[in-house]
């Protein structure tokens, strides 16, 4: 509590184009998604002392990480569980806050997630790379300049698959010859803070304990499948 009193509002960094989590609405310019559910569920959890949050949107995960290192934000909402990458980036990760079902789009007739596959990833998709290297370390990551290029690589057979949130896989499939296959490992999403900021991490882990079980994961599906 002392930390919050001295520090004031907790500055959250989020991704502006993160469907279901923090997709910025073009009219209100505010994020829509489970970031709002988290804030409303936990802001009063410490009793008399309400936790205040201040939101800043970013175009990419790299920019979020840089802002965290520069002390322009206190935490990132959200990263994927990956202890090795966290250590490389001098950050610590919270307990899992919510989980997302993940699918691959592939042209391979008999796709097997337990074999070594070549996965196309757009260069700036840090979350995707963290998810793959943690859950499927034996897959070979091939980077492309954009998700459109990654898509093309799979269509042409240059790569076996690319990874998407399960809900979006169906939208992408409408205009493609590929098929969507759900992976058995979900994406475990967590908060990130700098390594020194253990007090805030303790506070965040306590807020996660107060969340109704899998509430945010199920809310995520509602947002992701909303028409639009």
What are the roles of these predicted feature ranges?
Residues 80, 103-172:
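Pocket-lining segment of extracytoplasmic ligand-binding domains
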Residues 25-28, 90, 101, 117-118, ...:
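Residues at structural and domain junctions
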Residues 1-2, 33-46, 108-129, 133, ...:
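Extended ligand-binding regions for polar small-molecule ligands
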Residues 19, 36, 40, 52-115, ...:
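Acidic, polar ligand-binding/catalytic clefts
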Residues 42, 46-50, 72, 77-80, ...:
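Sec/Tat-exported extracytoplasmic proteins
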Residues 27-34, 56-60, 68, 96, ...:
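Extracytoplasmic/periplasmic, Sec-exported soluble proteins
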Residues 1-85, 140-152, 204:
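Extracytoplasmic small-molecule ligand-binding "clamshell" domains
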Residues 11, 103-105, 190-192:
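Residues embedded in well-ordered beta-strands
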